[in-house]
């Protein structure tokens, strides 16, 4: 072994060897164990959340492989419709082109080209994390095999009456020109206004006041709602109001949705542009009035004609034109064609001129913003495709979506067939499914799975694998030519099929990739369904987890996975959400490889366009990382993630903690070197009677206990606990204690004890390497290669070794009790040395008093080891009643362990030093107490700063107590 641990050289070497050897592929032996990688966007790069989640999955896969399971970690990437299309459109924009300049086929071809050039970035970064995934089976959601599964699911659901096309309210991105899912919408707090507007009754005798943050949508109002029990407005229900600035009249309706105690108790109802209003409109049969075109401009402008592009057929375009004309007739001409925000300004001014603007006041808004374009999302009535998830029975008597799709997915969790970890997330899952809406699955994009539907000239729909299949399965003959729907499917539609489509469904035989390599075979690979556990974030329980359960249950009759482990979200050391604009994001590869300050600043500010934000981020980075980020290596990063992986919703990543686990790796490396340096040449056989010494039997007992704990923690997904157990055993018991306890035997004259100790050192080290391997695979493999020949092991890699089972190790409780007593005595001596500032190298006298017969027997047995390891003279007993010298003492049970102080320290100097230190700490405590006693500080400082100050007081008081006790001992 090299003298020092150098992660970079080791990591690249071993990953390439593992992958080339086929070590990541299913063995074909043992019970199946499968984990599905949540497919990252093909556009993406590895972030801290990915690295954390993939470390958890990799630990599980490596652990189960060592336990003899037939493991498959199924990986792949998602085509990420909107994100990928946006990247290529941005490239075209730099060339002063649009996708329409290229045309659909040429644009899609260009996206494929970009994918081939850049799509492997994130998978190569996953390799850097050590992901032991079967890359030979890597899939892409636009692969032909997966595309075939998508088409079959769409066609089967459509023919079962479970997919329909309808005019519904959706999240509309007016910049991208497509519907988007809730997950692609961020609610951003912004400063805005609340406008209070007076609506007069039609007879002009009375009025009501309505408050709104979007006065422009008033043009689409169809009613004003009040609570049924609100006596103030009971007499107005059923009467009509004049809609300001228009010649329309709208009714006053009563609905329980209204909170009569909020504001004026009157709510304007705009069903075409608000989700809650849409539901109210449905209940009261109010026809929505759409006032916007698809560019979020008031209807009546020159770009309205472009909106016909989203109509699927000439007949539908005609219908849309009639609907737009009807809406347009209700909009005053002066607002037509205006951008929504221009219209807002003009409408507010006109309301003020008309004397109908009662009040304007500042208001904090939660604005829905598109994740991809930064445009403000507009609720919009458009024609889209939907999966029915809410009806019990269809008109023709067939089961509706709730019965056929939703309820089986609910039952899978309620019955315990699928379990969530932590368990409370099952409530989130069931609550969402209990209140589910039909799923909008169409997107107005070019990149994605094109919807397999065609329209004739009369607007009739034909669905099939292709046009010929659609015609063959048509109930009626098409009128004229057929034209395929221009829309593509929601990315989540193909992702919902991931558990079984990646295994080869629905193909009858082997599925091959573009290189002709077999990547799946349903008949063989369905043994991996259900997978063992899904590791994912809580933010996609609705969008992905539930939909996988729905689709998998419907098409295979099986659940997709047995357990769902919901991992935490990674935040910075202060608990703040990581974001580029805050300057607190970390690139996992920068932690692994290290990065100097200037490249780090340049990298972190590269995409920040606002000068003030860029300056703020640069200042923070220079403060937080004055010397850049040191390289800690993959293993230390993985250990950090494992140690943080609790059941909490968030984890705080502190680079200092990661540096601590780099020190752990160094400690393990040096311990292995110590063991190997104390071995003779050749294989080390187990001597007869081994283990001979109590120290050996103690370390083996503790190893057994630790392995048992680790196995339980793997089962319960308490990665933080298993990391702690492995850390404490390796650092404290193996390195700090057993290596020390072994020295007397290794250096003594008892050849049998020396041989036995050498063998036990090897056995324990090799077992620890196996136990640590799922967490820190690179360093353990490198060390194991030097250890294996000494034990006569013939495997090529640590990955081929079995998990070290606790039940294979014998425990010796008696030996453990003896060594624990011995450790306590040594710890007492060392604590006194530390407290009294006595050099560890200085030999000191050791006195013992009190105790019982067992203590005397143990002292006699361990006298030489105590003197050797504690650097003391031979222990001397002070008999009862004898005078005792001034001494510092530690207590072990009833035994007193004493170090006489005479001649060891300058009592006067030590008293002075202690007095100064006590005074200094008292001052620090007063400072902290002063801050916390300041009400303004407590009220205005960040919560984490207040917590830190309180913790400082606790820590200072602990230290102060210890120092005062030392001073008392000195008299």
Map each language-model feature to its residues.
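Feature 926 captures the class I aminoacyl-tRNA synthetase adenylation module centered on the KMSKS loop
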Residues: 196, 431-493, 497, 554-634, ...
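Short conserved beta-strand and strand-loop elements enriched in small hydrophobics
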Residues: 197-199, 239-245
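Active-site-adjacent "gating/activation" loops or surface patches in catalytic cores
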Residues: 247-253, 487-529, 732-739
């Amino acid at each position: 072994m090299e003298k020092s641990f150098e992660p970079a050289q080791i990591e690249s070497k071993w990953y390439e060897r593992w992958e080339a050897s086929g070590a990541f592929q299913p063995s074909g032996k043992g019970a199946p164990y499968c984990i599905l990688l949540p497919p990252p966007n093909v556009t993406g790069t590895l972030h801290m959340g990915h690295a954390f989640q993939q470390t958890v999955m990799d630990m599980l896969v490596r652990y189960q492989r060592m336990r003899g399971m037939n493991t498959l970690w199924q990986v792949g990437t998602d085509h990420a419709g909107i994100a990928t299309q946006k990247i290529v459109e941005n490239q075209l924009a730099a060339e002063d082109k649009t996708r329409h300049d290229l045309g659909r086929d040429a644009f899609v071809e260009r996206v494929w080209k970009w994918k081939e050039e850049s799509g492997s970035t994130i998978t190569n970064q996953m390799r850097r994390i050590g992901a032991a995934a079967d890359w030979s089976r890597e899939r892409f959601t636009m692969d032909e095999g997966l595309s075939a599964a998508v088409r079959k699911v769409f066609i089967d659901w459509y023919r079962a009456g479970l997919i329909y096309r309808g005019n519904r309210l959706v999240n509309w991105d007016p910049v991208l020109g497509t519907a988007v899912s809730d997950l692609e919408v961020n609610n951003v707090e912004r400063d805005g206004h609340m406008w209070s507007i007076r609506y007069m009754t039609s007879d002009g005798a009375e009025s009501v006041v309505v408050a709104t943050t979007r006065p422009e949508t008033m043009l689409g109002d169809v009613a004003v709602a009040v609570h049924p029990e609100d006596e103030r407005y009971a007499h107005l229900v059923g009467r009509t109001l004049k809609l300001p600035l228009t010649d329309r009249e709208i009714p006053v309706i009563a609905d329980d949705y209204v909170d009569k105690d909020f504001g004026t108790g009157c709510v304007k109802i705009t069903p075409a542009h608000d989700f809650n209003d849409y539901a109210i409109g449905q209940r009261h049969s109010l026809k929505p009035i759409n006032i916007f075109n698809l560019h979020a401009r008031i209807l009546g402008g020159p770009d309205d004609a472009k909106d016909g592009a989203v109509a699927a057929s000439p007949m539908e375009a005609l219908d849309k034109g009639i609907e737009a004309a009807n809406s347009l007739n209700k909009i005053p001409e002066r607002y037509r064609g205006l951008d929504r925000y221009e219209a807002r300004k003009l409408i507010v001014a006109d309301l003020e001129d008309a004397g109908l603007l009662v009040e304007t006041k500042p208001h904090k808004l939660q604005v829905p913003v598109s994740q991809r374009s930064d445009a403000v999302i507009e609720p919009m009535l458009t024609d889209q495709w939907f999966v029915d998830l809410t009806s019990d029975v269809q008109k023709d008597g067939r089961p509706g979506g709730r019965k056929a799709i939703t309820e089986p997915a609910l039952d899978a969790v309620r019955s315990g067939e699928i379990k969530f970890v932590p368990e409370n997330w099952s409530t989130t899952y069931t609550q969402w499914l209990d209140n589910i809406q039909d799923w909008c699955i169409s997107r107005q994009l070019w990149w994605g799975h094109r919807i397999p539907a065609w329209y004739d000239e009369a607007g009739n729909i034909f669905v099939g694998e292709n046009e010929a299949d659609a015609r063959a399965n048509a109930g009626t003959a098409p009128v004229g030519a057929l034209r395929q729907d221009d829309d593509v499917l929601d990315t989540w539609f193909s992702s919902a099929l991931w558990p079984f489509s990646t295994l080869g469904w629905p193909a009858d035989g082997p599925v091959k990739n573009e290189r002709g390599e077999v990547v799946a075979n349903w008949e063989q690979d369905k043994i991996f369904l259900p997978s063992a556990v899904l590791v994912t974030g809580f933010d996609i329980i609705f969008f992905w987890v539930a939909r996988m359960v729905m689709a998998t249950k419907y098409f295979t009759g099986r659940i997709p996975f047995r357990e769902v482990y919901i991992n935490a979200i990674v935040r910075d050391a202060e608990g703040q959400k990581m974001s580029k604009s805050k300057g607190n994001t970390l690139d996992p590869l920068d932690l692994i490889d290290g990065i100097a300050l200037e490249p780090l600043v340049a990298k972190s500010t590269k995409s920040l366009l606002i000068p003030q934000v860029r300056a703020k981020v640069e200042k923070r980075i220079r403060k937080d990382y004055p010397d850049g980020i040191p390289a800690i290596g993959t293993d230390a990063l993985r250990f950090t993630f494992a140690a943080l992986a609790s059941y909490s919703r968030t984890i705080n990543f502190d680079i200092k903690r990661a540096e601590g686990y780099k020190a752990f790796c160094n400690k393990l490396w040096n311990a292995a070197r110590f063991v190997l340096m104390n071995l003779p040449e050749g294989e080390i056989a187990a001597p007869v009677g081994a283990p001979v010494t109590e120290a050996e039997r103690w370390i083996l007992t503790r190893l057994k206990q630790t392995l048992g704990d680790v196995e339980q923690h793997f089962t319960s997904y308490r990665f933080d606990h298993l990391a702690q157990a492995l850390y404490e055993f390796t650092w404290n018991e193996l390195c700090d204690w057993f290596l020390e306890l072994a020295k007397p035997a290794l250096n003594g004259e008892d050849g049998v004890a020396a041989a036995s100790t050498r063998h036990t050192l090897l056995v324990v080290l090799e077992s620890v390497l196996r136990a640590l391997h799922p967490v820190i695979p690179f360093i353990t493999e490198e060390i194991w290669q030097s250890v294996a020949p000494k034990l006569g092991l013939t495997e090529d890699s640590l990955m081929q070794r079995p998990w070290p089972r606790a039940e294979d190790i014998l425990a010796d409780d008696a030996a453990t009790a003896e060594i624990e007593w011995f450790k306590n005595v040594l710890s007492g001596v060392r604590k006194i040395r530390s407290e009294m500032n006595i050099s560890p190298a200085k030999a000191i006298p050791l006195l013992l008093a009190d105790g019982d017969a067992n203590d005397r027997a143990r002292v006699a047995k361990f006298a030489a080891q105590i003197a050797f390891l504690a650097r003391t003279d031979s222990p001397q007993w002070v008999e009862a009643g004898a005078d005792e010298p001034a001494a510092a003492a530690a207590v072990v049970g009833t035994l007193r362990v004493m170090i006489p102080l005479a001649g060891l320290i300058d009592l006067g100097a030590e008293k002075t030093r202690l007095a100064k230190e006590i005074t200094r700490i008292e001052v620090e405590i007063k400072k902290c107490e002063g801050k916390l006693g300041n009400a303004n500080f407590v009220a205005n400082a960040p919560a984490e700063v207040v917590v830190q100050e309180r913790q400082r007081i606790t820590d200072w008081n602990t230290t102060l107590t210890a120092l005062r006790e030392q001073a008392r001992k000195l008299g």
